[in-house]
Amino acid sequence: MAKEISKVVKLQVKGGAANPSPPVGPALGAAGVNIMEFCKQFNARTQDKPGKICPVQITVYKDKSFDFVVKTPPAAVQLMEAAKLKSGSGEPNRKKVASVTWEQIRTIAEDKMPDLNAFTIEKAMSMVAGTARSMGITVSGDAPF
């Protein structure tokens, strides 16, 4: 018989840097999870992504055991990395802060494909381009699709 789910916790934690301090400690402590065990497992799984923000979905069961799924870094974070920005525009419709190419959009879309609800790479690219526009980042060149 399957385990009964008690709670689902979603967090964004830097890869390889989970520790019991906020936001990890309070969120998992309230769910009754062994925080140090989660931190050890998370850091082991994300050691290849040091410093990158990794969304994680933790499923806590009634017997206080847990499973977790690490997702790819958010498109906004990858776009800021590609455009070498610290933050997006405060007024994205008026003030453009950077520009990225369609090749950069494609690499981000290919990386994000498992987490996006898109069937083709072109649709995933248009989703990432929409995120870029909402951040005040222009996409240079003609769309390849």
From Swiss-Prot:
Cross-referenced InterPro entries: Ribosomal_uL11, Ribosomal_uL11_bac-typ, Ribosomal_uL11_C, Ribosomal_uL11_C_sf, Ribosomal_uL11_N, Ribosomal_uL11_N_sf
Pfam families with a match to the protein in the record: Ribosomal_L11, Ribosomal_L11_N
Presence of the UniProt keyword rRNA-binding in the record: yes
Entry keyword annotation includes Cell division: no
GO cellular component entries: cytosolic large ribosomal subunit
Molecular function per GO: large ribosomal subunit rRNA binding; structural constituent of ribosome
Biological process (GO), any one: translation
Post-translational modification: One or more lysine residues are methylated.
Domain of life of the organism encoding this protein: Bacteria
Keyword vocabulary terms for this entry: Methylation, Ribonucleoprotein, Ribosomal protein, RNA-binding, rRNA-binding
Membership in a protein family: Belongs to the universal ribosomal protein uL11 family.
HAMAP family: Ribosomal_uL11
Function noted in UniProt: Forms part of the ribosomal stalk which helps the ribosome interact with GTP-bound translation factors.
NCBIfam families: L11_bact (TIGR01632)
Quaternary structure note: Part of the ribosomal stalk of the 50S ribosomal subunit. Interacts with L10 and the large rRNA to form the base of the stalk. L10 forms an elongated spine to which L12 dimers bind in a sequential fashion forming a multimeric L10(L12)X complex.
Descriptive protein name: Large ribosomal subunit protein uL11
The species this protein was found in: Flavobacterium johnsoniae (strain ATCC 17061 / DSM 2064 / JCM 8514 / BCRC 14874 / CCUG 350202 / NBRC 14942 / NCIMB 11054 / UW101) (Cytophaga johnsonae)
